[in-house]
UniProtKB/Swiss-Prot annotation:
Name under which the protein is recorded: Acireductone dioxygenase
Record text on subunit structure and interactions: Monomer.
Gene3D superfamilies reported in the protein's UniProt record: Jelly Rolls (2.60.120.10)
Functional pathway: Amino-acid biosynthesis; L-methionine biosynthesis via salvage pathway; L-methionine from S-methyl-5-thio-alpha-D-ribose 1-phosphate: step 5/6
Free-text cofactor note: Binds 1 Fe(2+) cation per monomer.
Its EC number(s): 1.13.11.54, 1.13.11.53
Species this chain originates from: Alcanivorax borkumensis (strain ATCC 700651 / DSM 11573 / NCIMB 13689 / SK2)
Cofactor(s) required, per the database record: Fe(2+); Ni(2+)
Length: 181
């Protein structure tokens, strides 16, 4: 799996203005839009089916740095597999443009997901994969696609898990852009 960034005008969903696969270049473009994008490395090998404590321990230094920088209060690990009985419902839940009252911070331990951000007339499609951290600032319009056969393990950081409720914008813009196949 790879990571990539595609940038569009929100008025021209079929025309890619910028397409990047170099992670340093992706980080620069995203930073200019106020989005944190980093790569993390585990400080120890993970087992084949790691539990939450093992995953957090493997990335503890980066987690601690982010907590110190941003004041996050809660850390957990979420995973999704293709045979999850509610995968379709979970996918549908975040496919429409929405906002959260706090940052949405995700680090991909395994797998991938497509975050699409709608900022100042631009749409940023960020395909995140293993080793990628993305932090979507509070109140940024965005949507997320885990794909029809999702497979990922991600670390989540929160200020307040109750603040991570999706507030939908009512826009249909997400339907005009790419989804994971």
């Amino acid at each position: 799996m790879h990571s990539e960034l595609k940038v569009f005008s929100d008025q021209a969903p079929g025309r890619v203005e910028q397409h990047l696969t170099d992670k340093a270049a992706m980080a620069r473009v995203l930073a200019s839009a106020g989005i944190r994008y980093e790569q993390w490395q585990a400080n120890q090998a993970l087992s084949d089916d790691p539990q939450q404590d093992e995953v957090i321990q493997a990335y503890q230094a980066d987690i601690d740095r982010l907590i110190a920088d941003e004041g996050y209060q809660t850390v957990d690990v979420v995973s999704m597999v293709p045979d999850h009985p509610e995968k379709t419902a979970f996918r549908q839940k975040f496919l429409e443009e929405h906002r959260h009252s706090e940052d949405e911070v995700r680090f991909f331990v395994e797998g991938q997901g497509l975050f699409t951000l709608h900022i100042n007339g631009k749409v940023y499609e960020v395909l995140c994969s293993k080793g990628d951290l993305i932090s979507v600032p509070a109140n940024t319009p965005h949507w997320f696609d885990m794909g029809p056969e999702p497979r990922f393990v991600a670390i989540r950081l929160f200020n307040n898990p109750d603040g991570w409720v999706a507030n939908f914008t009512g826009s249909d813009i997400a339907q005009q852009f790419n989804r994971l196949a």
